[in-house]
């Protein structure tokens, strides 16, 4: 049967979701299935690039998008002359060198509640509130799968369209 999914948040093109929460309506009959059977059924119906890690029962009317209390995004940036080998489609590549300490210091200015209108797609902010609360914004050096990256982790209650991408790119 066709089911309408509600995702906790959207991802920009080229961005991968890790721990994306999704809500969907289920019938009483489906609720009677044990969790393992329902999980196996859902896994069988999803494309190979989607992994379902667990199922959670929620109250009727729950929306993964509107009832979420926080969201977290991680952007990986590879810097230097060589393009990342294994993560070329999971990281931004910047040919220059990045001053991670300066980036981290600048990031602290964006923590807290601010009007982020300048950090979103202009048309998406028309007649809409643009104040958001960023609970943390950290810039760190990380190594994953043998490659070095600068990771930008942003946590907040909600984000405007392209807000996180613009913060990271600025």
Report each predicted region and the residues it spans:
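Structured-RNA-binding interfaces characteristic of tRNA pseudouridine synthases
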Residues: 1-170
């Amino acid at each position: 049967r066709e089911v309408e999914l509600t995702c906790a948040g959207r991802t920009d093109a080229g961005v991968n979701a890790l721990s994306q929460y999704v809500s969907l309506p289920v019938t009483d009959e489906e609720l009677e299935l044990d969790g393992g059977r329902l999980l196996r059924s859902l896994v069988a119906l999803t494309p190979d690039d989607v992994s379902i890690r667990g199922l959670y029962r929620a109250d009727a009317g729950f929306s993964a998008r509107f009832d979420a209390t926080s969201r977290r995004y991680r952007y990986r940036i590879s810097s230097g002359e060589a393009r990342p080998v294994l993560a070329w489609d999971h990281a931004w590549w910047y040919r220059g060198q990045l001053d991670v300490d300066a980036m981290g210091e600048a990031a602290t200015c964006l923590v807290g509640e601010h009007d982020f209108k300048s950090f979103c797609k202009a048309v998406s902010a028309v007649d809409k509130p643009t104040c958001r609360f960023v609970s943390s914004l950290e810039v760190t050096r990380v190594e994953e799968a043998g490659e070095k990256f600068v990771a930008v982790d942003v946590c907040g209650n909600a984000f405007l369209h392209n807000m996180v991408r613009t913060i990271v790119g600025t």
